[in-house]
Each structure stands twice: as C-alpha cells, then as structure tokens.
Curated annotation (Swiss-Prot):
Domain of life: Eukaryota
Subunit structure as annotated in this protein's UniProt entry: Interacts (when phosphorylated at Ser-67) with ppp2r2d.
Subcellular location: Cytoplasm
Post-translational modification: Phosphorylation at Ser-67 by gwl during mitosis is essential for interaction with ppp2r2d (PR55-delta) and subsequent inactivation of PP2A. Phosphorylated by PKA.
Family indicated by similarity: Belongs to the endosulfine family.
This protein's encoding gene: arpp19-a
InterPro entries: Endosulphine
Assigned GO CC terms: cytoplasm; nucleoplasm
Phosphoserine found at: 28, 67, 109
Annotated protein name in UniProt: cAMP-regulated phosphoprotein 19-A
Record key words, sorted: Cell cycle, Cell division, Cytoplasm, Mitosis, Phosphoprotein, Protein phosphatase inhibitor
Effect ascribed to mutating residue 109 to A: Does not affect phosphorylation by GWL
C-alpha cells in the first residue's frame, strides 16, 4: 500500500508542476502590456518618495476650502504659540462651602441705581 501512496503523490506533484507551467505560459493581457511597457521604459518605476506631483503639492503648502477653514487654522497656530500663563492665585476652589461671613464686603457702586431712588 505504501507503494501506491508514493505513486499517487508523485502523480499529483507532476500534475501540479505541469499546471503551473501552463499558467506561466498563459499570461493575462494586462501582464503582457505591463511587460511591454517595462521593456520600453526601463527607468520608470515606483519612486521611493512618491510622485513628483505629490511632492510639489506638499511643498506648496495647505490650501483651504474657504475662509472659515483658514481662520480656524490660523487660530490654532496662535493658540500653540501663546505660552500658558502660570496661575498666580494660590486659592484652591472647592475646599469649603462659603458662608456670608467668609465673603468680602461688597463695594458701593459709583453710579447710583435708578431703582434705589
């Protein structure tokens, strides 16, 4: 029985090799056109940095859809450039609930109210 198994395996392998050779000979039309173009223009190929068009567009800078997009991008740049001011206040809010005695006295207004009169 082992002899029969070896024979069937050998037949399967040989048929697989024959099928592969047939597939290699039958080339799709796209592949044949690609081979012709590569033979005609050997210098053309995928460039590592992308296409020239893409590189040129990236060097030009960003284009904006409308003035709103431009203003939003401009505002983001300003926010990044502004240094964050350290808070000078040493008060910590939320430690206790204020009572009327804790609140500072209200300063009198310089302008007299029309309702008080």
């Amino acid at each position: 029985m082992s002899g029969e198994n070896q024979e069937t395996k050998a037949q399967e392998e040989s048929s697989a090799l024959e099928q592969k050779e047939i597939d290699d000979k039958v080339v799709s039309p796209e592949k044949s056109e690609e081979i012709k173009l590569k033979a005609r223009y050997p210098n053309l190929g995928p460039k590592p940095g992308g296409s020239d068009f893409l590189r040129k567009r990236l060097q030009k800078g960003q284009k904006y859809f409308d003035s709103g997009d431009y203003n939003m991008a401009k505002a983001k740049m300003k926010n990044k450039q502004l240094p964050t001011a350290a808070s000078d206040k040493t008060e910590v809010t939320g430690d206790h609930i204020p009572t009327p005695q804790d609140l500072p006295q209200r300063k009198p207004s310089l302008v007299a109210s029309k309702l008080a009169g």
